[in-house]
Amino acid sequence: MPKLGMREIRRAQLIDATLLTIDQTGLAGTTLASVAQRASISTGIVSHYFGDKDGLLEATMRHVLRDLWQATSRRRRAARADPRSKLRAVVAANFDAEQTSGPVMKTWLAFWSESMHKPQLRRLQHVNTRRLYSNLCADFSKALPRAAARRAASGLAALIDGLWLRGALSGEPFDTKAALRTANDYIDLVLASRE
């Protein structure tokens, strides 16, 4: 009889192996066998837990998204109640060290590419996009009229994605300070127009 919690431990081990495999070989070079080899377990166990490569990528992205959502919630709870602080918390969560590590960044890029072709991944991306927009819009709405808050939220979401994408593609370690400064300057600029 398996140990209590072994399923969760094994899944986490395989998700970590998937992140590292995508980092080293890209999505095309990531197979159930290569993940199994990295995790030092049989391919059959990977197949048992995830079914196929699509299931493995979906589970890995659910893990990455859960980390992002938890970081966002944690940072928003810790922030002061004013809109600027809440918005900065959302930005900081998106540029958190967990989200800007090499393996996670390469997995995000693979996920975005695959989400254009796979409905289950497209749905995950849509949920992520809506959650970010909703958080930003709610916070901007505390300081701006509704239409302006929506525009500001769309602008900041695009800026977060753009800064993140440029950082991911630069081939250098992600410059968190520069990304935070640019995004926070945008927040200050938008909110200053209403102060």
Swiss-Prot record:
Query: InterPro entries given for it?
Result: BetI_C, DNA-bd_HTH_TetR-type_CS, Homeodomain-like_sf, HTH-type_TetR-like_transc_reg, HTH_TetR, Tet_transcr_reg_TetR-rel_C_sf, Tscrpt_rep_BetI
GO biological process: what's one of them? glycine betaine biosynthetic process from choline
A single GO molecular-function term is:
DNA-binding transcription factor activity
Q: Which UniProt keywords apply?
A: DNA-binding, Repressor, Transcription, Transcription regulation
Summarize which parts of the chain are annotated to bind DNA, as ranges.
31-50
| Top-rank lineage group of the source organism | Bacteria
According to UniProt, this protein's pathway is: Amine and polyamine biosynthesis; betaine biosynthesis via choline pathway [regulation]
Identify this protein by name.
HTH-type transcriptional regulator BetI
Q: What is this organism's lineage? A: Bacteria, Pseudomonadati, Pseudomonadota, Betaproteobacteria, Burkholderiales
